[in-house]
Amino acid sequence: MSGVGVGRLIGVGTGPGDPELLTVKAVKALGQADVLAYFAKAGRSGNGRAVVEGLLKPDLVELPLYYPVTTEIDKDDGAYKTQITDFYNASAEAVAAHLAAGRTVAVLSEGDPLFYGSYMHLHVRLANRFPVEVIPGITAMSGCWSLAGLPLVQGDDVLSVLPGTMAEAELGRRLADTEAAVIMKVGRNLPKIRRALAASGRLDQAVYVERGTMKNAAMTALAEKADDEAPYFSLVLVPGWKDRP
């Protein structure tokens, strides 16, 4: 145990999936932690936990935070918001119990903790109650464009990060109005994303990458990919850099 007194919360970015892309500071934090918390689907340990597998102390206490099953509820439904809010509240209190007992709790977050990371929901609930440190991680999009060897922006280019869940017309408008884009949350939205890219005249530039930097990584021109549902770890890159020096 870290000692008598209030514990410390550490949000640890685990990067895009390759364990060798963990930062030195992240590895040190794992060595200091008394408790390891991570979000996951029921019955699974999650990708973040897999990334740090070989770095954990034998006496480390693990605190998996299992998401409720909400796939049958539309995200715009009030019932979804109620269930997910209750889940994050309960997760924060589970972590707080360890912090109040003086333990250092490291919370894993795939990519970067404060960029589309579930850790954020703990951070906003606990940062005003306990000492907090956030250790940044290499983002998934950075890992993907590095894997693809795809220069994305330069000079005064604007980069837009867009969720594939947004309305098709709005997605197409934003794609037409930016020099470069990263489209996250692909999943079952792939056909819609393809149509929006075609409507904005950007389909021929788009590159699809899944599981970037992981052992089973794959990439292809989006125009050549079938409209199958994409895995969770996938995104679409649309490069800018038209006026190359």
UniProtKB/Swiss-Prot annotation:
Pathway: Cofactor biosynthesis; adenosylcobalamin biosynthesis; cob(II)yrinate a,c-diamide from precorrin-2 (aerobic route): step 1/10. It catalyses: precorrin-2 + S-adenosyl-L-methionine = precorrin-3A + S-adenosyl-L-homocysteine + H(+). CDD domains: Precorrin_2_C20_MT. Coiled coil: none annotated. Its EC number is 2.1.1.130. Keywords: Cobalamin biosynthesis, Methyltransferase, S-adenosyl-L-methionine, Transferase. The keyword Magnesium does not apply. One of its GO terms (biological process) is methylation. One of its GO terms (molecular function) is precorrin-2 C20-methyltransferase activity. It comes from the Bacteria. SUPFAM superfamilies: Tetrapyrrole methylase. The keyword Zinc does not apply. Disulfide bonds: none annotated. Belongs to the precorrin methyltransferase family. Homodimer. This is Precorrin-2 C(20)-methyltransferase.
